[in-house]
């Protein structure tokens, strides 16, 4: 866990970028605070913008921090699988933190404005966004480990975006 926190400290600017991505969807719909299902859908809908970004970030970080020669040299050590997993979990944690912040903001605004909760389907709306964000991060990490090319990053961003749209 300490390695994940170290990577989170090193990549603190990703938290700000994920907050901006959440803001892009949140402030587009002004009436979201009057309906619970709209509010939660907007928070989880930002996954469509965040998932391609997180896949590209993970692919970039693998190429930048752990090039193929370094991964090959450390492959015999006991912690070789932690090389990219700690970094990926840190990126996922920033994405989940941004979703949690906007989920709290949305819930507070819905409570304050006495929003309608008739269309609320909580289990699916709260689970699918974080799972998709995590899956995109691991997909970007896996692609960067398997395909050692600069083209991995734009290909991952485009592929995840097209898969979600």
Which residue ranges define each predicted feature?
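Helix-loop-helix units of permease transmembrane domains in multi-pass membrane transporters
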Residues: 57-94
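Aromatic- and glycine-rich beta-strand/loop motifs that create alpha-glucan
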Residues: 1-15
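Secretory targeting signals
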Residues: 19-53, 58, 88-158, 163
């Amino acid at each position: 866990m300490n390695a994940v926190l170290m990577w989170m400290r090193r990549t603190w600017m990703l938290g700000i970028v994920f907050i901006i991505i959440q803001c892009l969807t949140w402030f587009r719909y002004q009436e979201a605070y009057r309906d619970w299902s709209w509010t939660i859908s907007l928070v989880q809908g930002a996954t469509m913008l965040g998932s391609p970004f997180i896949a590209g970030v993970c692919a970039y970080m693998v190429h930048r921090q752990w090039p193929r020669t370094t991964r090959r040299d450390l492959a015999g050590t006991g912690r070789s699988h932690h090389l990219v997993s700690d970094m990926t979990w840190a990126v996922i944690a920033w994405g989940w933190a941004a979703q949690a912040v906007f989920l709290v903001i949305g819930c507070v605004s819905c409570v304050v404005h006495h929003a309608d909760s008739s269309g609320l389907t909580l289990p699916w709306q709260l689970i699918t966004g974080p799972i998709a964000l995590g899956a995109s991060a691991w997909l970007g990490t896996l692609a960067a480990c398997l395909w050692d090319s600069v083209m991995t990053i734009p290909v991952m961003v485009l592929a995840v975006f097209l898969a979600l749209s």
